[in-house]
Amino acid sequence: MSQVNMRDMLKAGCHFGHQTRYWNPKMGKYIFGARNKIHIINLEKTLPMFNEALTFVERLASGKNKILFVGTKRSAGKIVAEEAARCGSPYVDHRWLGGMLTNFKTIRQSIKRLRELEVQAEDGTFAKLTKKEALMRTRDLEKLDRSLGGIKDMGGLPDALFVIDVDHERIAITEANKLGIPVIGVVDTNSSPEGVDYIIPGNDDAIRAIQLYMGSMADAVIRGRNNVAGGTDVFVEEAPAAAAVEG
């Protein structure tokens, strides 16, 4: 099993938190100190927690389970889409639509519409329409693809969420909590770890840090799938209860 090391995290700047005045006291036990009014995250705590999360994801993937990658803010979206595509996982990189998990039946209908429009665009149907109607359908297709393109092949609810910036994606986490779906999340010093089953204390803004988290998670999914291909029998453990997060 390939694991991330301290040097990787330092090079990526995972230890840089937010300004001290914006800190969340619930993250206090993961803070090493402060430098120039910026909180420094204790990577000696982060590293084993990150590797534990990677092990969990690898075990899930080995059981053919689906991990949904979520990162919709500007610094995360492109990386989330690229790494999710690399490992064949569903993702949300543009905007989290309310009810994406808790009202999946309705979302499924929108995905069906997306697929219909994709077929029409390919089979020449658009070319037979009036210019105005073709333009309207093209816009609908682009809008649906931007919102749902990353989950159109998910097939059903995911078995876990991996979230970059838990404050920014709080709606997604709340929906996952309601459905009992385990949440793995990168939690910065200004955020609350509430509702996150696998906490990864770390910088959730720096592109190099996001690349490290996402690349490592994608690698874990690929390793897990390879275990299945190789006939390895791997046990999937349950996520620790979110209630275990200390206030």
From Swiss-Prot:
Listed GO CC annotations: cytosolic small ribosomal subunit
InterPro entries reported in the protein's UniProt record: Ribosomal_uS2, Ribosomal_uS2_bac/mit/plastid, Ribosomal_uS2_CS, Ribosomal_uS2_flav_dom_sf
Keyword field: Ribonucleoprotein, Ribosomal protein
Signal peptide segment: none
One GO term of the biological process aspect: translation
GO terms, molecular function: structural constituent of ribosome
Family named by the database record: Belongs to the universal ribosomal protein uS2 family.
Stored PANTHER family: 30S RIBOSOMAL PROTEIN S2 PROKARYOTIC AND ORGANELLAR (PTHR12534), SMALL RIBOSOMAL SUBUNIT PROTEIN US2M (PTHR12534:SF0)
Protein name: Small ribosomal subunit protein uS2
